Each structure stands twice: as structure tokens, then as C-alpha cells.
Amino acid sequence: MFSCKQHLSLGACVFCLGLLASTPFIWCFVFANLLSLEIFSPWQTHVYRLGFPTACLMAVLWTLVPAKHAVRAVTPAIMLNIASALIFFSLRVYSTSTWVSAPCLFLANLPLLCLWPRLAIEIVYICPAIHQRFFELGLLLACTIFALSVVSRALEVSAVFMSPFFIFLALGSGSLAGARRNQIYTSGLERRRSIFCARGDHSVASLKETLHKCPWDLLAISALTVLVVCVMIVLHVHAEVFFGLSRYLPLFLCGAMASGGLYLGHSSIIACVMATLCTLTSVVVYFLHETLGPLGKTVLFISIFVYYFSGVAALSAAMRYKLKKFVNGPLVHLRVVYMCCFVFTFCEYLLVTFIKS
């Protein structure tokens, strides 16, 4: 049994890790909304909007780096992240011409920011389920704060509203060590120790073993993803569903996808129900988009993604349970979820940029 103090301490740490894991998406969101203007800076706009799928891919690539090397990168990464954010802050306040310096700064800092989701998820999904919800709450809250800052035009008025970004970096990086030292986390790590390996080693799931244990879950996630991508294409061409959403949807796709949703009951049943709801809602939008009006159409279109997120959350939770004896189970979860993020954000970029409704 663990004390209440240990649970509260770990809950606070993983909440801060959720704030930290949101930073690459917030970085992309801020640049895409503040510095993107297709008329005056076309190539910069493409760089910033492609930042979302790039961040997802880089987060996946960081999972291929051995854990000991990833941990060693923490100190230089946080120093460069804060330095880059300070330079961006200074450019916003004191410089009137950022058409070259800002894209270079954006591209230099993004790969290092993508380290944080890997380190955070590697810790969080070894902890009990209640602490995983605190992590997801932190990530969702961070994305919501910056989305509201853009909606209210606070970021356009003053660069001071970038300050939460610095707070997220400071709190999150400081919480990494605290979470690792917590006995709840270390006991979860101990349960993944292999009895057939030398002292200090843990069981690791290979690609073959992952495919053997979770074939239907991966197939169902792929089928759901293909279904929703087809829905996006059809509704974009026929119903102009992205009108007014292109500024905010990429952050929603990244944030909500990484946060998951509610999953109750059997994963396959939840996935089937959510796929059915996605299909029915898309049919309603397709045939009644003129009757629904802009607000009704937007609400129903967003609800399609909420259903999808809930279905994938149920399937990914089932995958984590099947891989609970392996220390890299959380990284498998990250790869699957962030590849789904990549597919959606890249598809949204292609549709909005090249396929006019």
C-alpha cells in the first residue's frame, strides 16, 4: 500500500508531465496562427502548418532512441527550448521583420521539444490508471489554454501570453525526476522486470511479439483511421467543413488524440459503436449541411473526431493491458497514437492547402 502523500505527489508530477508533453504541439500552434499569412509569406505558412505532422513523426522517432541516451538529452534540450522561446519572445516584442529568423528558430527547436512526449509517456503509462488521467488532463488543459489565447486574440495583442509555455517547460522538466523517484512508479517498473534476464533488465516487447499480442487492436485502429480520413475528404469537398476550422483543428487533433477519451466496457464493442456513430453523423452532415447551418455542421463534424478518439482510446487501453508486462508498452502506445495524429494532421494540411472545396 502507498500513502496518500505518495499518490498526491505522483499525481502532481504526472499532471505537469502532461503540460510538458503538450509543448511541441503548442509551439506549432503558436507559429501557425501568429506568423502564417499565405498572401505575404506563403513558404513560411507551409513550414508552420507542416509542423504538426512533423512533430508527430519526430515524437515517434524519439522512441527509437535508447532510454539512457534520451535521459541524457534532458538538460541540453530544456536549455535550448527555453533559449529558443526567449528569442521568439524577443522577436515578437522588438523586431518587425521575422520572415527568415522565425522559421529557422521554429525548425531548430521543434525536434528537441518532441523529446518530451516520449519521456513523459514512458513514465506515465507505467503508473496506475488514475495517474494516467491526471497526465491526460494536464495535456488537454495546456492545449485548451493556448487555443483560448488565440480565439481571444490575446497572443496577437501581447507576447506576454507566451508565458504559460515557459511555465509548462519548467514544471514538466522538473517533474521528470520526481516521478521517477516515486515508489508507485518504481514498483510498476519492478513488475516489468524479467525473471530470465540479468539484474536491472526489464522485459521488452519486440515488433513480432506486439503484432502477435495485439493484431486485432491494430487492425481496428487502422480501419477506424481510414474511415475517418475518407469522411474528412468527402465532407471537405461536399460540405466545406473546414471553413473557419483550419486555424484550430490541427491542435485539436493532436491534443485530443494524445489525451484519448472515455472508454468503458469491452474495447471491440466500443470501437464498433464509435465507428457506427462516425458513419451516421457523417451521413447527416453530408445530406443536411445546408439545413444545419455553419454552427450545427461544425459541431457534428467535430463530434465525428470525438467518437473516433473514444474508439481509439478503448483499443489503445486494451493494447496497453496486453503489453503490461513489458517496459516498452507505453512506447508502443505512443507510436500507434502519434502515427494516427500524423495521418490526420497531414491529411488536414493537404485538404485545406491543395484541395479547394
UniProtKB/Swiss-Prot annotation:
Disulfide bonds: none
InterPro entries: Herpes_BMRF2
Species name: Epstein-Barr virus (strain B95-8) (HHV-4)
Keywords associated with the record: Early protein, Glycoprotein, Host cell membrane, Host membrane, Host-virus interaction, Membrane, Transmembrane, Viral attachment to host cell, Virion, Virus entry into host cell
Predominant localisation class: virion
Lineage: Viruses, Duplodnaviria, Heunggongvirae, Peploviricota, Herviviricetes
Key word Transmembrane present: yes
Positions of short motif Integrin binding site: 199-201
Membrane topology, as annotated: Multi-pass membrane protein
GO biological process: symbiont entry into host cell; virion attachment to host cell
Keyword Glycoprotein: yes
Post-translational modification (record): Extensively glycosylated by O-linked oligosaccharides.
Domains (record comment): The RGD motif presumably is the main binding site to host beta1 integrins.
Purpose: Facilitates virus attachment to oral epithelial cells by binding to host beta1 integrin family. Participates in rearrangement of cellular actin to increase intercellular contacts by binding BDLF2 and thereby promote virus cell-to-cell spreading.
Protein's UniProt name: Protein BMRF2
Location(s) in or outside the cell: Virion membrane; Host cell membrane
One Pfam family it belongs to: Herpes_BMRF2
Virion surface side: 1-11, 33-46, 68-70, 92-98, 122-133, 155-158, 180-217, 239-240, 262-267, 289-298, 320-335, 357
Assembly information from the UniProt record: Interacts with BDLF2. Interacts with host beta1 integrin family.
Transmembrane feature ranges: 12-32, 47-67, 71-91, 99-121, 134-154, 159-179, 218-238, 241-261, 268-288, 299-319, 336-356
One GO CC term, this protein: host cell plasma membrane
UniProt record similarity statement: Belongs to the herpesviridae BMRF2 family.
